[in-house]
Swiss-Prot record:
Any Pfam family: HTH_7
PANTHER family (UniProt xref): DNA-INVERTASE FROM LAMBDOID PROPHAGE (PTHR30461), RESOLVASE HOMOLOG YNEB (PTHR30461:SF26)
CDD domains in the record: SR_ResInv (cd03768)
Originating organism: Sinorhizobium fredii (strain NBRC 101917 / NGR234)
SMART domains: Resolvase
Domain of life: Bacteria
Protein name (record): Integrase-like protein y4lS
Similarity annotation: Belongs to the site-specific recombinase resolvase family.
GO molecular function, one term: DNA binding
Length: 183
């Protein structure tokens, strides 16, 4: 049956060539590529296409579990969707093959560690931001809204929808500025 490959990197700066070569060597006839974050299933149209169109007996091939998902929950959602369709998941660089009991167990353990790694990275980032704030060198991102501009437009009689559209913000933000939430 068909083997469908999926290659993913986090940014466009990273190269997919090694993953694509490994997937070709694994016998993948079709390879979908994506350069998106693996932190969520949202915003990954190539992955969703595979999950929507894979058939019973086909194998979804990745190089490593972390190329597919960064949380156990997302990993389980993917595996459940594949299982419901009668398809399997195989990782070329790890002994994860959902068609075997041992492969399923190993796969779940890798998912736990991928989630753990993501949580550690978030903790380190939060610690770094806190330390930078203490030293006065981290200010956060600049505010997206121009409170004065919103108030001026409101005084001129413009409606919240037009203001939001023109300034690229949500209507709710306009209402909050009008109420005085953003002082």
């Amino acid at each position: 049956m068909a083997r469908i490959g999926y290659a993913r990197t986090f940014t466009t700066d990273q190269n997919l060539a090694a993953q694509i070569a490994a997937l070709r060597n694994a016998g993948c006839e079709v390879i979908r590529e994506e350069q998106k974050s693996g932190a969520s299933l949202e915003g990954r149209p190539q992955l969703m296409t595979i999950l929507d169109f894979i058939h019973a007996g086909e194998t979804f091939v990745i190089t490593r579990i972390d190329r597919l998902a960064r949380s156990l929950r997302d990993l389980q959602v993917i595996v459940d969707r594949l299982k419901a369709k009668g398809a399997h998941l195989v990782a070329t660089e790890q002994p994860a093959d959902t068609s075997t009991a041992a492969g399923k167990a190993f796969f779940d353990m890798l998912g736990v560690f991928a989630g753990f790694e993501t949580n550690l990275r978030r903790e380190r980032q939060a610690e770094g931001i806190a330390a930078a704030r203490k030293r006065g060198i981290y200010k956060g991102r600049p505010p997206k809204i121009d409170r004065a501009e919103i108030l001026l437009r409101l005084q001129q009689g413009q409606g919240p929808s037009k203001i939001a559209r023109d300034l690229g913000i949500s209507r709710g933000t306009v209402y909050q500025v009008r109420k005085g939430v953003f002082e």
